[in-house]
Amino acid sequence: MKRFLLNLLAVVVVAVAFSRCAGVSSLLKEGKPDEIYAKALEYYHKKKFNRASTLFEGVQRIYLGTTREDSITFYNAHCKFLSHDYETAATLFDDFRRRFGRSVFVEDAEGMYAECYYRMSPAAERDQTTTSKAIIAINEFISRYPESDKIDYFRELNDELTLRLHKKAYLNAYTYYKIGRYKSAIVALRNALRTYPESNYREELMFLIVDSNYRLASNSVASKQTDRYLAMLDSALSFGEEFPESKHIKEVNRMMDEARKYLDRSKKTEDNNIE
């Protein structure tokens, strides 16, 4: 009996879905443009965005060059956005803002274009190309609409995404450090600081430069150790000046002591050889 009821329910669901699709298809085939447009708006306001989008797309060509063209294009893009199809929505909003620069919807379209990329932006561990696009779009919106009532919201999005890029740069550099490729780590860490000097990871980046320099020097052949310990001391002094109260300061001081001891021994050996 239970199985019968489940099968019956499935049939009913399919039948209802089919009837709705049939209703939309029938309207597109037999309905007048104004009727289709009105029904699309009705579905839109009832939050039935897939059906609304189908109808908007069905009459889009009919209204080309009319006063309804921009509204149909905007509502269709918004349906995609509200259905979480952000990739399609971004394409449609981008097309809208280029074609309808004077539309009453253009500010909303610009904002949602930026927000599409924000919502598609992945976690910091993944490629951040989309995040960079989102930041560009968000800053374009902020620049064009400084009086918008959404300006604070978009500034918050910008800050969030910027922090994500900071984290990505840190993680990329840390990966080299973690696998023991200290020369590559030093380059990547310095590039991260150069690209994002205000990074929230600045202290950690600078400490890892010190540590990478120390490990590189410690594991180098004798002919390269002096120069590498000197480079380590330079980075350690910079770290100490900027972060004198850091949780890493004791470790940095320890590495500096070891480096100085090595340099002192090396100097004495060199002096003895001269004598």
What are these regions (language model features)?
Residues 6-12:
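Sec-dependent N-terminal signal peptides
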Residues 2-6, 17-275:
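Acidic, polar-rich low-complexity tracts and alpha-helical solenoid repeat scaffolds
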